[in-house]
Design a protein with these regions (language model features):
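Helix-adjacent hinge/juxtasegments
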Residues: 58-78
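General small-molecule cofactor/ligand-binding pocket signal
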Residues: 41, 81, 137
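Short, well-structured N-terminal submotif of metal-dependent ribonuclease cores
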Residues: 1-42, 57-65
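Active-site neighborhoods of divalent-metal-dependent phosphate/nucleic-acid chemistry enzymes
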Residues: 79-119
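Alpha-helix capping/helix-boundary segments
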Residues: 11, 46, 87, 107, ...
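Acidic, PIN/NYN-like endoribonuclease modules and their adjacent C-terminal/linker elements
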Residues: 2, 108-141
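Structured helix-beta-strand junction loops
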Residues: 36-37, 76-77, 115
């Protein structure tokens, strides 16, 4: 059975942002490998954060018409977890137990609800295991 992996927003940003070449290359490598060897997920939260960061907060902002094309690519390549009321409640539980920010807890809750075993993130604690199910990995280390 293939692993299920979840991508945090920063991995998706680096996938399309070429201003940090080393991280861009590594994000592409992990992304391509995951498409071949795993079932991959993001959430609607990741999509919306990507739009804001890629269009406004990176060194060379990506035009919205290109972001739209990138999103179409992601939609055909990945499974999209839709955040609902239960996901928000799960995020509160994760925050209370593990002390992540609420937004990181929402990413974790989405990954757990998608039955993922790996969460790729640059920002969260590398190697931590959540609920004995989900391991956080930093693909840039």
């Amino acid at each position: 059975m293939k692993d299920k992996v979840f991508f945090d927003t920063n991995i998706i940003v680096y996938l399309f942002d070429k201003s940090e070449e080393k991280k861009h290359t590594q994000a592409r490598k992990i992304f391509i490998a995951s498409l071949q060897d795993a079932t991959s997920y993001i959430s609607n939260q990741v999509i919306n954060e990507f739009i804001v960061i890629a269009s406004q907060k990176i060194e060379n902002p990506i035009p919205l018409n290109h972001i739209r094309k990138n999103l179409e690519f992601l939609r055909t390549s990945l499974n999209i977890h839709t955040i609902d009321f239960e996901t928000s409640l799960k995020a509160i539980d994760v925050k209370l137990k593990y002390h992540f920010s609420f937004w990181d807890s929402l990413i974790i809750a989405s990954a757990l609800e998608s039955n993922c075993s790996i969460l790729y993130s640059e920002d969260m604690q590398r190697g931590q295991v959540i609920e004995d199910k989900l391991r956080i990995l930093n693909c840039f280390e």
